[in-house]
Amino acid sequence: MAIYVAIGIRLTGVKEVLGMWIGGNESAKYWPGVLNEIKNRGVEDIMIVSVDGLTGFVDAIGAVYPQAEVQRCIVHQVRYTTKFVNYKDRKEFVKDMKAIYQSPTEELALEKLDEFDEKWGKKYASSIASWRNNWAQLSTFFKYPEEIRKIIYTTNSIENFNRGLRKVTKSKSIFPTDDALFKSIYLAMMDITKKWSGKAWNWGQTLDQLMIYFGDRISPEDLE
């Protein structure tokens, strides 16, 4: 059983939980329903979505929010990639991999990826293939300036939120029903989000950049 969480940032800079869903290893058919639920509750448009690697989720985003840009979480990608790497190689491997996603431009990142492939490709083919196959979503953040990159680069907001939820689920390992689990999770969510009164870091400059890239989709009412 898994708990799926969606967190958004309003144009006012305030974070908000958009929804939580309890399920198992969901198929690709599950995600359009989740996204349509979010849309029906009032989220009319999404500029950029930061995701991990759920099967079929990117396609579902394209169907429900066709204008949304998708950024695959770099932290999740690094974790997945290093699964295949021997311990003795890991430090050097991670250093070389970091040069890819810390490049200032996509062009330079692709050069670093080619170097990475040349050095490690024969030994860790699956790791390199993961970068190649997912590059379209891994490289989205290169389009934007630093202010926007810091927000979409990873799903850290959700990771931190989930860390708070785990304290609840670990303290009580067995729940009699899904409803009992959901109620406990909901109460934990309310406790966590009480601390979300402030705006995202450096939001004024971030909003300024968002207006440059997405201004035609933002109305004055959206900023209130």
PLM regions: where:
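RNase H-like nuclease fold core
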Residues: M1-V51, T55, V64-Q67, N134, ...
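Flexible, active-site-adjacent loop/turn segments at secondary-structure boundaries
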Residues: I7, M20, R41, I46, ...
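Short acidic, glycine/Ser/Thr-rich loop/turn "cap" segments at secondary-structure junctions
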Residues: E16-M20, V43-D45, V78, V94-M97, ...
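Conserved beta-strand -> loop -> alpha-helix junction used to position metal-binding or nucleic-acid-contacting
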Residues: I48-T55, A60-D96
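Acidic/histidine-rich catalytic cores and adjacent linkers
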Residues: P66, A99-E224
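A generic short alpha-helical patch detector that favors 3-5-residue windows
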Residues: G23-S27, V49, V70-C73, V85-D89, ...
